[in-house]
Amino acid sequence: MDEHVDILDKNGEPTGESCLKSEAHRKGLLHPTVHIWFYTPEGRVLIQQRGKNKATHPLLWDVSVAGHVAAGEKIVTAASREVEEEIGLTISEIDLESLGTFKAVHKISEDFIDAELHHIFLCQLSVPLNQLTIQEIEVEDLALVPLFKFAEETWGLASMGKYVPHGPTYYKTIIKAIKSRT
């Protein structure tokens, strides 16, 4: 869906301008997104396999839930909305624990520069995996993996080509945060 997104300056502050997501990607304009990482008290991480028709990183494993923040939308509202859309789970804003932001710029092609400020949240998964309902156009599959396996596969990037390449610093931040809560 080509929604309007707010444009941010290099420091992540709103410029007061917005445009279609496709234009932001074409021009490499920084815009906000949300990443929500679900975990269980037993130390398992919920990951999603991106849909096969996604423009970027199709069929790679990624953050539990992710999406763009619509123009004028509150960050936590976008996070809650994306969770409900992608995995069919209704959560409250108080369920979200902010880990801060992470700036990422990826040149996908000459006319697609993905410049995003990820607002990262943790959320404890309170239902069994089989109670989640995937949004098939966005998500191919869901899996709960042990944190140690997830760390092994992303920290050292031992499984290059399996996960979206967010980079070791990003993954280390997520892994350490989840580990301290389980």
For each predicted feature, which ranges?
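Acidic, metal-coordinating catalytic segment for phosphate/diphosphate chemistry
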Residues: 1-35, 39-41
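Residues that flank catalytic or metal-binding motifs in active/ligand-binding sites
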Residues: 3, 32-34, 41, 65, ...
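Conserved hydrophobic "DFG−1" position in protein kinase catalytic cores
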Residues: 7, 38, 47, 122-123, ...
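Nudix hydrolase/Nudix homology domain
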Residues: 22, 59, 71, 98-108, ...
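Conserved Nudix-box catalytic region and its N-terminal flanking loop in Nudix hydrolases
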Residues: 23-34, 44-81, 85
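Extended, positively charged loop/linker patches that create polyanion-binding surfaces
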Residues: 83-89, 102-106
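A short coil-to-beta-strand element that immediately follows conserved catalytic motifs
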Residues: 90-100
